[in-house]
Amino acid sequence: RIIIGNNVLIRTNVTIYVDTIIHDNCWINHNSIIRENVKILDDSSIGSNTICENNVSIGKRCLIQNNTMICSGSIIESFVFIGPGVTLTNNSPIGHLRDVKPIIRGPKLRLGCAIGGGVTICPGIEIGEESVIAAGSVITENVLPRIIISGNPAQKTKNIGKKGLIKKEIRKKYGF
C-alpha cells in the first residue's frame, strides 16, 4: 500500500511503488520515480527526474534537487541538501556474479550535510553531520562531521566549526 500525508504535492508523470510512505508537506516533482519501501518524512522535496530506488529513508526537511539518483539502501537524515545531478551508489559487484553474494550498502548522509551538484558518493560511505561536499567531488571514503571537502578523490579543505550549519531554532522546532 501507499500512504500519502496531508498537503503533499505530486506533480505529473510521477511513479510511486507499493510500501511507500510520504509524510506531510512534501513535494514530489515531475517525472520522478519512488520505488518500494521508501519513507519520506515531513517537509521534504524531491526534484524532477529523480530516481529513488527501494529501501530508502529520507528525513525531515530535506531538499533533493533535480536529476538525482538515490540508490537502494540509502539513508538520508533530516535537513540534508542534495544538489542537482548527484549520484549515490551501492554495492554492485563487478566480475563473475555467480559466486558473489549480493550485499546492498547505500551511503548514509547524516543530519544537515550539504552535497553540491554533480557529486558521486561510493557504496557504503558515511557523510558526517553538517559536512559540506563541493560540487563535482567524488567521495571514496567516509567524511568526518563538520568539514568541507572537495575534489576527485575528495579531500578535506577546512573545518566548519562547532556552531555547525543548522540554526538552534530550527533544531528545536523539529526536535533535534
What residues fall within each predicted segment?
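Sequence-level detector for tyrosine residue identity
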Residues: 17, 174-176
